[in-house]
């Protein structure tokens, strides 16, 4: 054993044998016992990271053209001022538009694809179109998250997304609903969460969410709202129930209500359709999960008791959920 061999080395030393004369066949001078396969995989992973960084660099440095995307803070201040609506396009929406499967909770659909393209190409003064800022200023994100974004945007993805966009148009940042977990520091969250709260302060709010969303429960995100009604939708493939969801919201909502939607790519289309007929509708994405993580001081995505977190495989106690306030707010359930 190595232990016994080390004692032999000690004996040799005591006998006055020079150290450089002792050949230690079982001593790992050159790391001969390391797992070469794992080393090779790690080297390949690191090489890929730098490959993606080099691929992204011309866009991040302004050498190649990128879409104009205004800040999340500017977007929220605009919504507060003019009560406009919001449709968001992140990786899930763009992947469906490319005919790919991305979000596990929504199957690919040609009708959804066509509607998303319609919304992205629309020009309505009272509807803000937001696109994920995956092109520049990635240094504000944690290194690992920035590298994940670069890896996603590599090869044909960036080109395909740019081809969907109007390079003469001004968009807003779809990461507005992701103000915390991606960022290196909390300053972004400290600016944006109060602005979200101002949007629904003293407003009658209708929350359209998946079965396990439970937005605003066990936190104070919506405490400043005047009232809350909830439309509970299927936790997956909400698009299959789109017309029923839309009609249910219309039946429940009053004209001055604020409609907040967290329903994956379906939310993008629903916010657009409701805004077109006179409602203020906002795709709030996963801002509630982000707020919970912010309140926890979490440094990575983690499960939230009683709530579905899309990126977490193990979600805690989804079925054994009891909250009288939440159940009293449910105006309709769609299954």
Regions found by a protein language model. Name each.
Residues 211-256:
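A mid-sequence, solvent-exposed acidic-amphipathic segment
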């Amino acid at each position: 054993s190595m232990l016994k061999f080390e004692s032999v080395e000690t004996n040799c030393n005591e006998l006055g044998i020079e150290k450089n004369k002792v050949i230690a066949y079982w001593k790992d001078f050159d790391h001969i016992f390391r797992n070469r396969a794992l080393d090779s995989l790690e080297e390949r992973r690191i090489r890929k990271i730098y490959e993606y960084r080099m691929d992204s660099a011309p866009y991040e440095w302004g050498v190649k053209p990128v879409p104009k995307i205004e800040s999340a803070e500017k977007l929220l201040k605009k919504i507060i001022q003019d009560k406009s609506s919001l449709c968001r396009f992140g990786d899930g929406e763009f992947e469906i538009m490319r005919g790919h499967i991305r979000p596990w909770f929504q199957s690919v659909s040609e009708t959804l694809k066509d509607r998303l393209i319609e919304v992205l190409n629309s020009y309505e003064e009272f509807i803000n179109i937001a696109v994920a800022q995956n092109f520049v200023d990635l240094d504000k994100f944690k290194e690992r998250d920035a590298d994940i974004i670069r890896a996603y945007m590599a090869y044909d993805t960036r080109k395909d997304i740019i081809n969907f966009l109007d390079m003469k148009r001004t968009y807003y940042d779809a990461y507005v609903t992701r103000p915390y977990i991606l960022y290196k520091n909390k300053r972004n969250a400290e600016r944006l969460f109060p602005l979200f709260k101002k949007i629904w302060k003293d407003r009658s709010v209708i929350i359209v969410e998946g079965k396990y969303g439970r937005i605003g429960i066990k936190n104070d995100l919506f405490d400043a709202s005047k009232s809350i009604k909830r439309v509970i939708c299927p936790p997956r493939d909400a698009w299959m129930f789109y017309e029923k969801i839309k009609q249910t919201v219309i039946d429940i909502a009053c004209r001055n209500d604020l409609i907040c939607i967290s329903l994956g790519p379906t939310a993008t289309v629903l916010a657009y359709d409701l805004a077109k007929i006179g409602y203020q509708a906002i795709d709030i994405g996963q801002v509630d999960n982000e707020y919970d993580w912010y309140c926890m001081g979490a440094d990575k995505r983690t499960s939230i008791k009683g709530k579905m977190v899309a990126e977490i495989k193990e979600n805690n106690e989804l079925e054994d959920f009891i909250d009288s306030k939440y159940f009293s707010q449910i105006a309709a359930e769609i299954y």
